[in-house]
Protein backbone atom coordinates (compact mmCIF):
# COMPACT_ATOMS: atom_id res chain seq x y z
CA UNK A 1 0.00 0.00 0.00
CA UNK A 2 1.30 3.48 -0.82
CA UNK A 3 2.39 5.94 1.81
CA UNK A 4 -0.04 8.85 1.98
CA UNK A 5 0.64 12.37 3.13
CA UNK A 6 -1.06 13.40 6.34
CA UNK A 7 -3.66 15.78 4.93
CA UNK A 8 -7.05 16.76 6.37
CA UNK A 9 -9.15 15.33 3.55
CA UNK A 10 -7.47 11.92 3.77
CA UNK A 11 -7.97 11.94 7.55
CA UNK A 12 -11.67 12.77 7.25
CA UNK A 13 -12.14 10.14 4.52
CA UNK A 14 -10.40 7.55 6.66
CA UNK A 15 -12.73 8.42 9.54
CA UNK A 16 -15.76 7.97 7.25
CA UNK A 17 -14.48 4.61 6.03
CA UNK A 18 -13.97 3.39 9.60
CA UNK A 19 -17.54 4.39 10.49
CA UNK A 20 -18.92 2.57 7.43
CA UNK A 21 -16.92 -0.58 8.23
CA UNK A 22 -18.33 -0.61 11.75
CA UNK A 23 -21.90 -0.39 10.46
CA UNK A 24 -21.24 -3.24 8.00
CA UNK A 25 -21.73 -1.27 4.79
CA UNK A 26 -19.49 -1.46 1.75
CA UNK A 27 -16.55 0.95 1.91
CA UNK A 28 -15.32 3.14 -0.90
CA UNK A 29 -12.08 5.09 -0.67
CA UNK A 30 -12.38 8.67 -1.89
CA UNK A 31 -9.78 11.40 -1.64
CA UNK A 32 -11.93 14.44 -0.91
CA UNK A 33 -14.79 15.06 1.59
CA UNK A 34 -17.06 16.75 -0.97
CA UNK A 35 -16.86 13.63 -3.15
CA UNK A 36 -17.63 11.50 -0.11
CA UNK A 37 -20.75 13.58 0.54
CA UNK A 38 -21.89 13.26 -3.08
CA UNK A 39 -21.30 9.50 -3.32
CA UNK A 40 -22.50 8.46 0.14
CA UNK A 41 -26.10 7.16 0.02
CA UNK A 42 -26.47 7.72 3.78
CA UNK A 43 -24.96 11.15 4.50
CA UNK A 44 -23.88 11.63 8.10
CA UNK A 45 -25.28 14.59 9.96
CA UNK A 46 -22.55 16.62 11.61
CA UNK A 47 -23.31 18.56 14.73
CA UNK A 48 -22.05 22.13 15.11
CA UNK A 49 -19.08 21.13 17.26
CA UNK A 50 -17.85 18.62 14.66
CA UNK A 51 -18.27 21.17 11.88
CA UNK A 52 -16.39 23.77 13.90
CA UNK A 53 -13.53 21.34 14.63
CA UNK A 54 -13.28 20.47 10.95
CA UNK A 55 -13.17 24.16 9.94
CA UNK A 56 -10.57 24.94 12.60
CA UNK A 57 -8.34 22.04 11.52
CA UNK A 58 -8.59 23.14 7.87
CA UNK A 59 -7.70 26.73 8.77
CA UNK A 60 -4.75 25.64 10.90
CA UNK A 61 -3.48 23.37 8.16
CA UNK A 62 -3.84 26.07 5.51
CA UNK A 63 -2.19 28.72 7.67
CA UNK A 64 0.73 26.39 8.38
CA UNK A 65 1.12 25.67 4.70
CA UNK A 66 0.88 29.27 3.51
CA UNK A 67 0.67 31.90 6.27
CA UNK A 68 -0.24 35.34 4.97
CA UNK A 69 -0.73 38.71 6.60
CA UNK A 70 -4.44 38.50 5.79
CA UNK A 71 -4.91 35.17 7.56
CA UNK A 72 -3.17 36.51 10.66
CA UNK A 73 -5.40 39.61 10.67
CA UNK A 74 -8.50 37.43 10.31
CA UNK A 75 -7.44 35.16 13.16
CA UNK A 76 -6.74 38.09 15.49
CA UNK A 77 -9.97 39.93 14.63
CA UNK A 78 -12.08 36.80 15.16
CA UNK A 79 -10.49 36.16 18.54
CA UNK A 80 -11.07 39.79 19.52
CA UNK A 81 -14.76 39.57 18.52
CA UNK A 82 -15.22 36.38 20.58
CA UNK A 83 -13.46 37.99 23.54
CA UNK A 84 -15.54 41.18 23.37
CA UNK A 85 -18.78 39.15 23.12
CA UNK A 86 -17.82 37.29 26.30
CA UNK A 87 -17.08 40.58 28.04
CA UNK A 88 -20.55 41.92 27.14
CA UNK A 89 -22.34 38.79 28.33
CA UNK A 90 -20.46 38.75 31.67
UniProtKB/Swiss-Prot annotation:
What InterPro entries is this protein classified in? Answer: Flu_proapoptotic_PB1-F2
GO cellular component, alphabetical, reads:
host cell cytosol; host cell mitochondrial inner membrane; host cell nucleus; membrane
Miscellaneous comment as given in the Swiss-Prot or TrEMBL entry: Is not encoded in all strains, and seems to be dispensable for replication.
**Can you say where in the cell this protein is located?**
Host mitochondrion inner membrane; Host nucleus; Host cytoplasm, Host cytosol
Lineage of origin: Viruses, Riboviria, Orthornavirae, Negarnaviricota, Polyploviricotina
Major subcellular location class: host cell
**What is the role of this chain?**
Plays an important role in promoting lung pathology in both primary viral infection and secondary bacterial infection. Promotes alteration of mitochondrial morphology, dissipation of mitochondrial membrane potential, and cell death. Alternatively, inhibits the production of interferon in the infected cell at the level of host mitochondrial antiviral signaling MAVS. Its level of expression differs greatly depending on which cell type is infected, in a manner that is independent of the levels of expression of other viral proteins. Monocytic cells are more affected than epithelial cells.
Here the segments flagged for biased composition (Polar residues) are: 1-16
Question: Under what name is this protein listed?
Answer: Protein PB1-F2
Pfam families to which the protein is assigned, alphabetical: PB1-F2
Amino acid sequence: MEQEQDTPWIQSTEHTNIQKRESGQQTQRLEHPSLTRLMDPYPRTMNRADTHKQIVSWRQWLSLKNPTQGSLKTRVSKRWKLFSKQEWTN
